[in-house]
């Protein structure tokens, strides 16, 4: 036989109506009675849990998540500086927060791309050109045989220098 534990309590802060509706119902009286919601929660204990196995301190309640919520979870890899538009295109941008850009715009637009990897590569190239070889990137540093290792400004990155 299953055992059911009912916990009932009144939440004085929860109401179904606003305070304006309360005063209208009472004919505009200045005294308002504070109403709350009476809530009842039930916990079902399965008889298969014997009294020997059931330790109150170690009992854990399982939370069941419906499968439909698990399906909507995104499993795609996220890249730094890359986001997806609602219609499926990928965009890359460098954001400068808290004055890190020193007089530059807050957001440096890098473009729109068909895949997340293309957008991440554009971010990496611009980040290395803008910040230098120690810039945070998605794929690590490019090959060492690049002839141009100079750090350039944001306007040159935006023009595609």
Swiss-Prot record:
Function comment: Probably acts as a transcriptional activator. Binds to the GCC-box pathogenesis-related promoter element. May be involved in the regulation of gene expression by stress factors and by components of stress signal transduction pathways.
CDD domains for the chain: AP2
DNA-binding residues: 78-140
Recorded family membership: Belongs to the AP2/ERF transcription factor family. ERF subfamily.
Region ranges (Disordered): 1-35
Single annotated GO MF: transcription cis-regulatory region binding
GO BP terms, alphabetized: ethylene-activated signaling pathway
UniProt name for this protein: Ethylene-responsive transcription factor ERF070
Gene of this entry: ERF070
Any one GO CC term of the record: nucleus
Taxonomic lineage of the native organism: Eukaryota, Viridiplantae, Streptophyta, Embryophyta, Tracheophyta
Keywords tagged on the record: Activator, DNA-binding, Ethylene signaling pathway, Nucleus, Transcription, Transcription regulation
Pfam family, one: AP2
UniProt KW DNA-binding keyword: yes
Entry annotated with the keyword Transferase: no
Protein species of origin: Arabidopsis thaliana
Subcellular location: Nucleus
């Amino acid at each position: 036989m299953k055992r059911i534990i009912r916990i009932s309590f009144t939440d004085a802060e929860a109401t179904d109506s606003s305070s304006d509706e309360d005063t209208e119902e009472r004919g505009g009286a200045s005294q308002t009675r504070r109403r709350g919601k009476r809530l009842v929660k039930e916990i079902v204990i399965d008889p298969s849990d014997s009294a020997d196995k059931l330790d109150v301190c170690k009992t854990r309640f399982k939370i069941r998540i419906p499968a439909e919520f698990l399906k909507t979870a995104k499993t795609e890899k996220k890249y730094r500086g890359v986001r997806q538009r609602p219609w499926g295109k990928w965009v890359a941008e460098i954001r400068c927060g808290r004055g890190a850009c020193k007089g530059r715009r807050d957001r440096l637009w890098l473009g729109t791309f068909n895949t997340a990897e293309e957008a991440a590569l554009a971010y990496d190239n611009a980040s290395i050109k803008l910040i230098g070889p120690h810039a945070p990137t998605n794929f690590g540093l490019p090959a060492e045989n690049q002839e141009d290792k100079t750090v350039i400004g944001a306007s040159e990155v935006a023009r595609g220098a």
